[in-house]
Design a protein with these regions (language model features):
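Extended, charged alpha/beta regions that create polyanion-binding interfaces
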Residues: 1-54, 59, 569
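Short alpha-helices
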Residues: 126, 205-242, 246-258, 629
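Short, small-residue-enriched loops and turns at beta-alpha junctions
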Residues: 120, 145-150, 198-200, 217, ...
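Acidic, two-metal ion nucleic-acid-processing modules in DNA metabolism proteins
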Residues: 132, 137, 269-364, 378, ...
Length: 709
């Protein structure tokens, strides 16, 4: 397990008081206005104001914790939506509009060329529908993930040319298609690129390149996704304020924005809020069928619903089959056909989940067979014929588990590997991969996610090169802390105060759902959920208790029992039960009550030592155990079963300041064969190995490393 610190933000008490008062007054005035037929006495106003102050404190606390301390700024944020900037401020938007409008006037066929992910599909649908509504002769085309790969290809361009089309408009791709753009130009095809990815030094040859991340672009908001840029293009073609365009295609832009994990701030917040409202009352048969399929018909739709229910199904088409299925659903105008497609996408998504778990299992078996891979700063895993459509998700899962950058590569029958990598905050995966460009066939991406192609015979060299770069650039790779907003007490929480947090939504990138810390909470029970795939804990503070689900953690993996006292990092929500509205939680992390951040800091040093990172004498001394401490650790492991994947309860028992020494002791005992991590009922526990002769602790490699000067 990767241990990480918790960073609970500090709140200025004076600012909190001022914010609470401002929010309460605003809410009271709104209530008075809504009840303007009723005359309010001064006494009633004061009474309502006092009640509002009680309920506004939690919301004000989150705002203050996130640095929003000015009441005017806070009220503006809570009021709703930022104005959308003029689409014509995007560089080359005028050129793009001029060429497209000319094509419409002259009856030219326009090909909208998208991508196979949700952003690419929604961007394609958005622009296709709008151009069709303008009377254009328009077709759309999506690449195949396996057959074509990402973005424009010469084969696709040739196919478009052979069909007599002479204008291509890309959405969510094209900014890096330098060779392909030159090929299109050589055939006499005009190319308009709309994209949101970071350009390379050389821009493609095109009639227009609309990308807010161009160095010479002066539009105010740079966080648009591909569907967001397509939305701006539609507004520019219409010559209307973009807010008006939201009424027609805000749902598509919102789904693309959330699915592509774009920051839900600024203009994206406006787009997504409008799109979510539209989704709840959508008249698109495709979205109606999909909402019915996932059990959201007639219910409020949130950004989280898009992330965890809608987007995975739309994405599954491009991962496992053809993204055309997702596009057909979004564009479908027949209810029966839409229902068929929505059900098909769910079936494909189940297939995706099964395939993903097979590869996760295979990857874990690799790590179990070669545990030294876990000491790598960058974990590179590969396998024959792993489905390339899901290796990115597998990489994400392994990053969550290991706390390190992970690249997963699928090797085909021709000996070529296609890889997808995910990173952690503070480690630029793209730069790391770029340092190996001479042995790669292709690569691309950004700091947090990247892809590559490599020959099978170069994979071992690639593993070494990646880790050499990481050793130079990030000698001690610390896991980013868990950012917590507020420490709260259950006795002081109310259903209404938690409900008011909805004003901060939509939640997503750069605007995460609030994280709360429950200190000194007593575990009153651990229960299996969904046949043991997840678990639910009952936690008590004072006179109040709450049920909190822990996704992906089955009961046997929980290193806490009834009666244990813990600190819990959780998110809060409200659900309707037969007993009325109730609070519920989702566990993010648990640790023993009072355990601070020293444990995570020392665990990072031990991890660095095991990877061969040179430590200072002071650092070595801080984690070097005396023989007596190793004996103490051995006796603890002998006395009871300790979870191998989460030793925080042992850290708390033996002293947080001894965390590094405890981890070194466990590693040394394992290295000399005195203990082993055994799988028992789906969880790993440390167990003693029956003695087979005398063991010498001094032979443990980790202790030898500490002795080196």
């Amino acid at each position: 397990m990767t241990y990480r610190a918790w960073n609970t933000k500090t709140v200025d008490r004076a600012a909190l008081k001022e914010l609470t008062a401002a929010i309460a007054q605003q809410n009271t005035e709104e209530l008075e206005y809504q009840n303007m037929d009723e005359e309010w006495s001064e006494e009633k106003y004061r009474s309502v104001l006092a009640a509002q102050q009680k309920e506004a404190g939690l919301l004000a606390g989150i705002l203050a914790a996130r640095g929003i301390t000015d009441p005017a700024e806070a009220l503006t944020l809570l009021a709703g939506e930022e104005e959308l900037s003029d689409p014509m401020l995007l560089t080359d938007m005028d050129k793009a509009c001029e060429r497209i409008l000319r094509a419409i006037d002259e009856g030219e066929t326009i090909v909208v060329f998208g991508d196979y992910d949700v952003d690419g599909v929604t961007a394609t649908a958005l622009l296709y529908q709008h151009l069709k509504g303008m009377g254009a002769a328009v077709k759309c085309m999506l690449p195949s993930r396996e057959g074509d790969g990402y973005g424009l290809s010469k084969n696709a361009i040739q196919s478009i040319y052979d069909k007599g089309c002479r204008l291509i408009v890309t959405v969510d791709n094209g900014i890096s298609a330098v060779e392909e753009a030159a090929f299109a130009a050589s055939l006499g095809i005009d190319l308009i690129i709309t994209d949101h990815h970071l350009p390379h030094d050389t821009l493609p040859q095109a009639v227009a390149i609309v990308d807010p991340r161009r160095a010479d672009d002066h539009s105010p908001f740079k966080g648009l996704c591909g569907a967001g840029v397509a939305f701006k293009l539609c507004a520019a073609l219409n010559g209307c304020p973009p807010e008006e365009m939201l009424e027609y295609c805000g749902d598509l832009a919102a789904v693309g924005t959330v699915a592509d994990v774009m920051p839900l701030t600024g203009e994206n917040r406006t787009i997504v809020k409008a799109g979510l409202r539209q989704l709840q009352n959508t008249d698109r048969p495709g979205f109606c069928a999909l909402l019915e399929e996932v059990g959201l018909a007639g219910k409020p739709v949130t950004a989280e619903n898009i992330s965890y229910a809608i987007a995975p199904r739309l994405n599954a088409a491009g991962r496992m089959d053809s993204a055309v299925t997702a596009l057909q659903l979004v564009l479908c105008e027949d209810e029966d056909r839409a229902e068929e497609l929505a059900h098909k996408l769910s079936d494909i998504n189940i297939q995706r989940q099964e395939t993903e778990m097979e590869i996760v299992k295979a990857a874990q078996e690799l790590l179990d067979a070669e545990p030294e891979r876990l000491e790598d700063r960058v974990i590179l895993l590969w396998g024959r014929d792993w489905h390339p459509g899901v290796i990115g998700i597998v990489a994400s899962r392994l990053v969550e588990k290991t706390g390190r950058p992970v690249i997963v590569v699928s090797v085909d029958e021709h000996g070529e590997g296609k890889g997808s990598g995910r990173s952690v905050q503070g480690f630029n995966l793209h730069e790391c991969i770029a340092s190996c460009a001479d042995i790669l066939l292709r690569f691309g991406g950004h700091a947090m996610a990247a892809g590559l192609s490599v020959r099978e015979e170069d994979l071992q060299t690639l593993r070494q090169r990646l880790n050499d770069w990481a050793a130079r650039e990030c000698p001690v790779l610390r896991t980013p802390p868990l950012e917590c907003d507020l420490s709260v007490h259950l006795d002081r929480l109310t259903v209404e105060s938690v409900r008011r947090l909805d004003q901060l939504a939509p939640y997503g990138a750069d605007n995460p759902s609030p994280v709360f810390v429950l200190e000194m909470a007593v575990v009153e029970g651990v229960y299996a959920v969904s046949e043991g795939k997840h678990c639910r804990l009952r936690l008590r503070q004072g006179n109040s208790s709450i049920y909190a689900v822990w996704f992906g953690m089955h009961p046997e993996q929980v290193p806490y029992s009834t009666g244990d006292v813990v600190d819990a990092a959780i998110s809060l929500s409200v659900y309707d039960s037969p007993r009325g509205a109730q609070l519920s939680g989702r566990i993010i992390e648990l640790h023993p009550a009072g355990l601070g951040n020293t444990a995570a800091e020392q665990a990072a040093l031990v991890q660095a030592l095991r990877r061969g990172t040179p430590l200072t004498p002071e650092q070595k001394e801080s984690i070097a155990p005396e023989r007596s401490h190793i004996i103490t650790v051995y006796r603890e492991l002998q006395a009871r079963r300790w979870h191998a994947e989460d030793l925080q309860p042992l850290f708390a028992k033996l002293g947080e300041e001894n965390t590094g020494r405890t981890l070194v002791a466990v590693a040394a005992l394992e290295q000399v064969g005195l203990i082993t991590a055994a799988d028992r009922g789906g969880a790993k526990f440390w167990e003693l190995v029956p003695a087979t002769g005398k063991k010498n602790l001094a032979d443990a490699p980790i202790l030898k490393c500490l002795e080196e000067r």
